[in-house]
Amino acid sequence: MKITFLGANHEVTGSCTMLEAAGQRFLIDHGMEQGKDVYENEPLPVAPGEIDFVLVTHAHIDHTGLLPLLAHNGFRGRIYATTPTVELCGIMLRDSAHIQEFEAEWKNRKGRRAGAEPVEPLYTIQDAEAACRLFVGVAYEKRIQLAPGIEARFVDVGHLLGSASIELWITEGSTTTKLVFSGDIGNHDQPILKDPAYIQQADYVFMESTYGDRIHGPRPDYVGELAKILQRTFDRGGNVVIPSFAVGRTQEMLYFLREIKEQGLVRGHGNFPIYIDSPLATEATRIFQDTDPDCFDEQTRALLEKGIDPIGVPGLRISVTSDDSRMINTDRVPKVILSASGMCEAGRIRHHLKHNLWRPECTILFVGFQAVGTLGRTLIEGAETVKLFGEPIEVRAEICQLTGMSGHADRDGLLQWVEAFTEKPRRVFVIHGEDEVENIFVNTLTEHGFTACAPYNGAQWAIGAEGAVCLQEGTKVRMEQRAGEGTNRAATVFQRLVSAGKRLLRVIEHNEGGANKDLAKFADQINALCDKWDR
């Protein structure tokens, strides 16, 4: 079999690995690159129509965000994921498509005034819906056959609702080799989700390393800290505005807010209102509430058995329309506002910041990672003014963080996961980590007796009975340009064109033996298209 590392190698986003084994060609994840780009992802080396199926570890866009593009360019196979992941992808991929369409529309409005060529969205809502129709839901712990000689099992890894490690048994000839893809390994003792499950055996392991260089430290008292922030803000007559990731973090905050209200930890403010002002967060919350209780941890299941909704909070109000959102800030009653995006780069949260940042009685509470260059990072680093909707806003609100909240295991958690194998795997491939972090974690694994390496994007390895052999090292050269719009987007769009060309060749081959009249018409259409673009 052959393994090609296409994305999230020596960087964190854009996860994608291609396997060619037992006569099949398939992907583990197909994610979108986000934030700062260090090493450019490799384009698919084959046409999307030549991919037989995809396995998805979890619903985050950096693991799934290019699936609509894959469908647009001719992929028609099945996409296997756990049932909660299928549900979450149904809303997250559509939301991603809306963002792509909105950004293209905005650029075209500006471009028309400058006489620029129209910009096409990376993909559309129709592409997202086409991808969603290809999903097949799979239960945890159920071993399934994907093709002759290929079996898989999804194991709960505690990172996000539906997240999984994937066990693969691949039989070629008389030899069966077991691969394990860790997915994103969850943190221990987090609300709602189970702790990561451990796997007993593997020949080769592909594991993430996001926090492979650090220790989270003791778990903070989230409920106590949050209650203190609410108390002092409400006593001042202000709002607590929480920029929050729509899927996962918003539901954790609802869990904590329910506990605060049940225990009466905020005094003198009665049943203070809590607003969810994010359509995506609202849909995600519904999915959490409708999910099989077996997906949750023991404490959450115990609440459900008592008839208690773990994320159902008295005083919770759902903001659906834009008018609903605007009305929130006309009411001066102290309140909690949960809104996306979590890094304040887009979405309704920016309107709430405009209305609350300048008020010294209010608090802006960050509960997740803030990437360099984002508005959220600017605020926590002490900016005195920021610009929102073209208007300078003075930062007079209290800015604070609820630290220690992470959906990723730290170094010790990663070691605990990999050391659970009863015998050491023949090799551990370290992926999904920043450049230096991957190198540090490879050294850590080596010190613990593992054979480990950190491949680069484009690396190829052959795995057989004799072991694993590196066929190609991949690209070690860092990108000159860091983020988003330039080299990476251009390469992605050009790859769409290449894929379209490969698809055209397949269509030509399928028409062999057709009526001469039809073939002549087809040839004329192709030549006319070539004449238009051969410039």
Where are these regions (language model features)?
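Charged, amphipathic alpha-helical linkers/stalks
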Residues: 458-521
